[in-house]
A protein has these predicted regions:
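Noncatalytic, beta-rich nucleic-acid-contacting surfaces in large DNA/RNA-processing enzymes
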Residues: 1-194
Length: 194
């Protein structure tokens, strides 16, 4: 699965299908993260039968390998804050792509907060330049949490897959009311039933 993801685009299996199949076979898939990902998707050790797959930055639409190399060099032992990531020299558009991909979880910033921070921080710093380090007070704005469906939509828009839920899960009840048969039940149907 890891090699298939690194070989994209191939024209047939989409990343979401590869990840879904790997998960169905017991493989742990870990998200893109500023502190853990490399350009390529990689295998990580874990207890159990299989290695885990860490999604690489190549999964994030619009990122360039050169930008990722800057990030990887700058992170050293790891970023502790989003402020440190911003100071790495990445452009605002790269930071926004990373935020859209929800890649700041290890620095305790969820997608919406990270998007807010990377899209406003530079503009605010330019107007009110100060030399203080990032503090909790810098994050006093309480943004509403994103709904799971919003996360999934944004995951697909930014990485072509979601580790949070399948898009059909949000309409499963309506499909059941329409008497649609889930694909997992098709093998139980007799000819002419479906």
């Amino acid at each position: 699965a890891c090699a298939l993801l690194n070989s994209q685009p191939m024209g047939f299996y989409q990343p979401a299908q590869i990840v879904s199949d790997a998960r169905n076979h017991g493989v742990d898939i870990r998200p893109v993260d500023v502190n853990h990902s490399l350009w390529d998707n990689t295998l990580e050790e874990k207890s159990g039968k299989y290695c885990a797959i860490r999604l690489g930055f190549r999964q994030v639409k619009g990122l360039k390998e050169d930008d990722v190399n800057i990030l990887i060099q700058a992170r050293g032992e790891g970023f502790r804050t989003l402020h440190e990531v911003r100071d790495s020299g990445l452009s605002e558009s790269v930071l926004e792509r990373l935020a859209n991909a929800d890649a700041f979880r290890s620095v305790r910033r969820d997608r919406r907060d990270a998007l807010w921070d990377v899209s406003t921080k530079g503009k605010i710093d330019g107007m009110f330049k100060s030399k203080h380090h990032e503090t909790e007070a810098d994050h006093a704005i309480e943004l509403p949490a994103m709904a799971l469906s919003e996360h999934v939509i944004q995951d697909y828009a930014s990485t072509s897959l979601s580790l949070k839920a399948h898009p059909v899960s949000f309409v499963r009840e309506e499909l059941s009311q329409l008497r649609s048969i889930p694909i997992s039940k098709l093998s139980e149907c007799k000819n002419g039933m479906a």
